[in-house]
A protein has these predicted regions:
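Regulatory and interdomain segments flanking nucleotide-handling catalytic cores
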Residues: 1-277
């Protein structure tokens, strides 16, 4: 029975292994996590930019950076997060799940969904504590809409290897997409689809200024070109036992992941990205 059982198990694992694919080791890897049907999820949120959603995405990015092995840089814009992973810091550095594509995609998407749900709930509690404690949100349709969306967001993920020289270019591509999305979002918040049809981003900016007095350049940086996340040294206070056995607070320096809500334009400052890879 034991041999038959082992034979059956080996046969089943053989079917699994046929579809098991791996990325190339020792070159940078990109994970891109995308919100599933976020055009529906974001319905009823503030336009053109919802700060609750943006902060939630930023905190989700930070969680992924902190918890995915080998991650060295994160970037988020709109409903997507791009992560840069390396496995060559030392001669013995290992890769996340051995760069098993199925594992990386499924786990990163699951992690993003979990982290987003937790971060989203935390933002609602922080900004609308009374509404979170009551089933009656009164006449505030916005808060009611946000609360109703709790636990409904989902993400998918894709992973791929990329030459080291192309990592910054990949992020430039995503940041340029962020800028285009940003301008179009402000446009859609102020003009009809018919009025915007066939208009370039420069034309939309001109329309916003001439007809509504809105200067797109005045929006916060993270609204215009996304946010980044990287690890850096930060000063913190921590408890320490002194010679007398008493606890005192001392200043320490530790490596922490931080969110940069004012990243530069990557095409103009490539070193901002390239120093991490």
């Amino acid at each position: 029975l034991s041999k038959k059982y082992d034979s059956l198990g080996d046969r089943m694992k053989g079917y699994e292994n046929i579809a098991r694919n791996y990325l190339t080791r020792r070159i940078p890897t990109i994970i891109r996590v995308d919100g599933k049907a976020f055009h529906t999820f974001t319905r009823g949120m503030e336009k053109p930019f919802d700060r609750i959603l943006m902060t939630t995405m930023q905190n989700t990015m930070k969680y992924l950076c902190e918890n995915i092995q080998g991650c060295v840089f994160g970037y988020t814009q709109s409903d997507e997060i791009t992560l840069v992973l390396t496995d060559y810091a030392t001669i013995t550095t290992d890769a996340w799940f051995g760069y098993n594509i199925q594992k990386m995609c499924s786990v990163s998407a699951s992690m993003a969904t979990l982290a987003f749900s937790n971060a989203y709930a935390a933002e609602l509690w922080k900004n609308f504590p009374e509404a979170m404690c009551s089933s009656d949100n009164g006449t505030n349709k916005y808060i009611e809409t946000l609360v109703a969306k709790m636990g409904t967001a989902m993400f998918d993920a894709r992973v791929f290897s990329i030459p080291k020289d192309e990592v910054c270019n990949c992020l430039i591509w995503r940041q340029q997409d962020a800028t285009r999305n940003s301008i179009e979002s402000v446009g859609h918040a102020n003009f009809s689809q018919k009025e915007l049809h066939g208009k370039s981003c420069n034309s939309i900016q001109d329309m916003l200024w001439k007809e509504h007095g809105i200067n797109w350049n005045d929006f916060p940086v993270d609204c215009k070109r996304g946010s980044a996340c990287y690890k850096t040294k930060v000063k913190e206070t921590a408890p320490l036992l002194n010679d007398k056995g008493d606890t005192e607070m001392v200043e320490v320096v530790r490596n922490r992941w931080v969110i940069d809500r004012e990243p530069p334009i990557f095409s103009q400052e490539r070193g901002y990205v390239e120093k991490w890879i």
